[in-house]
Every structure is written in structure tokens, then in C-alpha cells.
């Protein structure tokens, strides 16, 4: 068995790699940071192939698929956020975020999905966020990208179900947890986040139970439920105030 993980050099990607290695998966670890991948490899008990790539590039994503064909589990984990009013945030950073958070997920999912359907076997885990559900003033582009990942993944689930395929797909929607995401996005969370170890363990359990939507933590589940019943304008006010507290 072999798993391919993007954004594998730190945080959730790193923890997922180590845990899957303990379950017997050989690994293909993708990141822009080869040195950090080397450190992850030392903690893995199975074969780990390291591949330096920037998944914001369409060509890089296609090359990954061409180079690593025999994949049983794809985890699209690479992603980042950006804090600020839409009128003030960097357009270049936002476009890069869309490339990483959306385009790369779309390309790699689509390419590997075709392979998995052909052999009627395989799993895909796309990492979204609880941010997929509420509106996201002050982190607008990030929330929008995660909403795309959620809808994209759940739609594929139904397509697979209708065709009677054995291929499984899941979407992980964690709340705040402790990774380098905060530093990159330029935020600090007002609520104490879950540990990365907890989120990765919960993700793997949900993945192998064939859960479609994986939401770690009771508080995060409550938050998800509230987004389904609260009026939109109330959600906008609540979310804006929560986002403002994140400002470093």
C-alpha cells in the first residue's frame, strides 16, 4: 500500500505521514521544503519517497501524477490562509492560495480518481476546514477555497456511490489546531485549538471508517451545526467578530 501526501513537511501532513507509516503504508511525501521532508522521513518506519514540488503549479501537479502512478491513498493536505479585509489583502497571495487550496486539490483528485475508478480501489482524503461552512469576513478567500474543497469532495462521493464504485473519498473539516498555519496566515486563535496529534488520529479513524465528512472535536461539531440553522446575517456578524480576535 502506498499513500501520497501533499504538504507533508510539517503539521498535519507530517503527523498523517508518520501515523500511516505505522499502519504499514509506504509513502510519497510532497513539499516545497526538501530538508523538512528529510526530517519527516526519519520518523517513518516504511519506505518514504521525497519529492520537492510546488503544487500551485498545474505542471507540477500533472508531473506528480505521471511520476507516481501506483497510489492507494491520496491526501490533499497542502494549503494556507491569509488574514485581512478583501480590499487590502495581496492579490498575488490570494491567487497563489487559490492555486494551492483549490486548483491543486482539483487536479490531483481528478487524475488519481480516474486511476482508482479503473482499478475499483483506493481512497482520497481532501483537507478542508470548519471554515468551509460559515461566511468568512476577514479571511474571505481562505474560507471560499475550503468551501470549494468541501463541495467538490462531497459531490464526488455521490458520483462514486451512484456508479457502485469501491473507491472511497472523505473530507476533513477541523477547527483551529496547533500548526504553522497561524504564522503563515498572520493570525492567532482566541480559542484553544486541538493538538495536531488529535486531529491526525481522528482523521485516520474517520478515513478508514469510510466517513464522508470528518469533523474532529465536539465544539467544532457544534459550530458546524450552528452554521446550518443560524440566519446568514447573524452568522456574518458572529464570524466577523471571531475573525477580528485572531488579528495578531
Enumerate the language-model features and the residues they cover.
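Conserved glycine-rich Rossmann-like NAD(P)H-binding loop of the short-chain dehydrogenase/reductase
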Residues: 23-39
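C-terminal helical subdomain
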Residues: 171, 188-224
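Active-site helix of classical SDR
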Residues: 109, 145
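Conserved glycine-rich cofactor-binding loop
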Residues: 9-10
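Residue(s) in the substrate-gating loop at a strand-loop-helix junction
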Residues: 129
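Substrate-binding pocket helix/loop in short-chain dehydrogenase/reductase
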Residues: 85-86, 93-98
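Conserved NAD(P)H cofactor-binding loop of Rossmann-fold oxidoreductase domains
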Residues: 77-82
Amino acid at each position: 500500500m502506498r499513500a501520497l501526501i501533499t504538504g507533508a513537511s510539517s503539521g498535519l501532513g507530517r503527523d498523517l505521514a508518520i501515523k500511516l507509516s505505522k499502519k504499514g503504508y509506504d509513502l510519497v511525501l510532497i513539499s516545497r521544503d526538501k530538508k523538512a521532508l528529510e526530517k519527516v522521513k526519519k520518523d517513518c518506519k516504511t519506505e518514504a519517497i521525497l519529492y520537492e514540488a510546488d503544487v500551485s503549479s498545474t505542471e507540477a501537479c500533472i508531473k506528480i501524477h505521471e511520476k507516481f502512478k501506483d497510489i492507494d491513498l491520496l491526501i490533499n493536505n497542502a494549503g494556507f490562509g491569509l488574514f485581512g479585509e478583501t480590499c487590502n489583502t495581496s492579490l498575488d497571495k490570494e491567487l497563489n492560495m487559490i492555486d494551492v487550496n483549490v486548483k491543486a486539490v482539483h487536479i490531483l483528485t481528478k487524475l488519481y480518481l480516474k486511476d482508482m475508478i479503473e482499478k475499483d480501489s483506493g481512497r482520497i482524503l481532501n483537507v478542508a476546514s470548519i471554515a468551509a461552512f460559515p461566511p468568512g469576513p476577514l479571511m474571505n478567500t481562505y474560507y471560499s477555497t475550503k468551501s470549494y474543497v468541501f463541495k467538490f469532495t462531497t459531490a464526488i462521493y455521490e458520483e462514486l456511490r451512484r456508479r457502485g464504485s469501491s473507491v472511497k473519498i472523505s473530507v476533513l473539516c477541523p477547527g483551529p489546531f496547533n500548526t504553522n498555519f497561524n504564522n503563515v496566515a498572520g493570525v492567532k486563535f482566541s480559542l484553544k485549538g486541538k493538538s495536531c496529534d488529535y486531529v491526525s488520529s481522528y482523521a485516520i479513524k474517520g478515513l478508514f471508517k469510510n466517513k464522508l465528512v470528518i469533523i474532529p472535536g465536539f465544539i467544532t461539531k457544534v459550530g458546524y451545526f450552528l452554521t446550518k440553522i443560524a440566519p446568514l446575517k447573524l452568522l456574518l456578524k458572529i464570524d466577523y467578530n471571531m475573525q477580528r480576535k485572531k488579528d495578531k
